[in-house]
Amino acid sequence: MKNLVIFAFLFLSITTVINGGITSKFVRQALPSIEMSLDTFPSPGGYNTPEQVHLTQGDHDGRGMIVSWVTPLNLAGSNVVTYWIATNGSDVKPAKKRAHASTKSYRFYDYSSGFLHHATIKGLEYDTKYIYEVGTDKSVRQFSFTTPPKIGPDVPYTFGIIGDLGQTYASNETLYHYMSNPKGQAVLFAGDLSYADDHPNHDQRKWDTWGRFMEPCAAYQPFIFAAGNHEIDFVPNIGEPHAFKPYTHRYPNAYKASQSTSPLWYSVRRASAHIIVLSSYSAYGKYTPQYIWLEQELKNVNREETPWLIVIVHSPWYNSNNYHYMEGESMRVMFESWLVNSKVDLVLSGHVHAYERSERISNIKYNITNGLSSPVKDPNAPIYITIGDGGNIEGIANSFVDPQPSYSAYREASFGHAVLEIMNRTHAQYTWHRNQDNEPVAADSIMLHNRHFFPVEEIVSSNIRA
């Protein structure tokens, strides 16, 4: 009994519980988010050596992979990826195949990019490790990836969740903290990648350094990206009037496979998850292309095959931080009822440089006569995760609204990442890991219950540590 009292005292001393929610009193040490210098991740040595190698899903169902890389010169053979099934020490000689990349480059103000190669590999076997090589002659570089299991309702799969990463020393902690978890198989990235636009004239060299920084992870497992505000790069005053130019040149996706008309909104299916990516910074009003696409996309979801329905959108619809408070409100008003009616499990956002998890709530009952304008608990609603805590140069958003709203279940002003471990059609373990802890430590965790197959209330476990 004495130990129980001591535990309760310690727990309450480092948390604040308001209206059922928890505000962690853990605040990241008040140090600036110092950006790594341009030479922290130099180009690899050798002649025309590929760099900034990264992966994303290359089709709708996980049998395709887009392999991307950059070379200084566009020489013969530099646009080819060679790949084969890993034989794990077997004497059987693997059958090697080749895929040719589309190659492009771009100019931005006074910057000229290298040659950006994007090769789509199709017809891969499910749940199989592949070796792949890019480059020619003595500049060949070798990597590997593993395809997801075949689509199915009880297929286990583990996603990392990262947002607003940037390229500071804190960003480095976040990425390598995630990489130390051997379970991670693919990353859901909630927008704001390089933060090149935080530098004079949107210094495009920062896109190159970010690509090199990410390569140890992104060359081995695919990233499913949403675009954030730091990807807009709309600067007409320096002659750059085309939004998302660097982002779309460097980070393509298979948007046409989901009948989208834009790479800024699309969907993929992976294992037992159906993932929908939306754009906070593209038109979404009635009858716009994104609106029309999402309306049809939600009808296309087959929960019998992919029970876990996840939406990624950069600007959060529910956020109790003073930073960017209610910026996502107009998009929420437009689409929230669709997500509730479709029983979306999880909505992932960034933008706010802190961590927050909501209750299952909705605010869709309002009409001009009833005045119902506050969020209420709703078992059909998604849980909203704000994961803009990757570590970028702009630092932590440590000013939460007080008192904590009832819709906010847990919030904390520190850097970190999350992991979603799907177990089967009914259960998935969600954990959030702050950078200051060892990887196995989960500062916030919840066993999610699938809204389609097991729509019962979840039990929360938050382990708050000073």
Curated annotation (Swiss-Prot):
Keywords for the protein's UniProt record, in alphabetical order: Glycoprotein, Hydrolase, Iron, Metal-binding, Secreted, Signal, Zinc
Distribution of this protein across tissues and organs: Specifically expressed in flowers.
Subcellular location: Secreted
GO cellular component: extracellular region
Signal peptide: 1-20
Positions of Zn(2+) binding: 192, 229, 314, 351
Swiss-Prot/TrEMBL catalytic activity: a phosphate monoester + H2O = an alcohol + phosphate
Positions bearing carbohydrate: 88, 172, 367, 424
Presence of keyword Transmembrane helix: no
Broad EC category: hydrolase
GO molecular-function terms, A-Z: acid phosphatase activity; metal ion binding
Any Pfam family matching the protein: Metallophos
SUPFAM superfamilies, sorted: Metallo-dependent phosphatases (SSF56300), Purple acid phosphatase, N-terminal domain (SSF49363)
Subunit structure as annotated in this protein's UniProt entry: Homodimer.
Protein name (Swiss-Prot/TrEMBL): Purple acid phosphatase 6
Native source species: Arabidopsis thaliana
Lineage of producing organism: Eukaryota, Viridiplantae, Streptophyta, Embryophyta, Tracheophyta
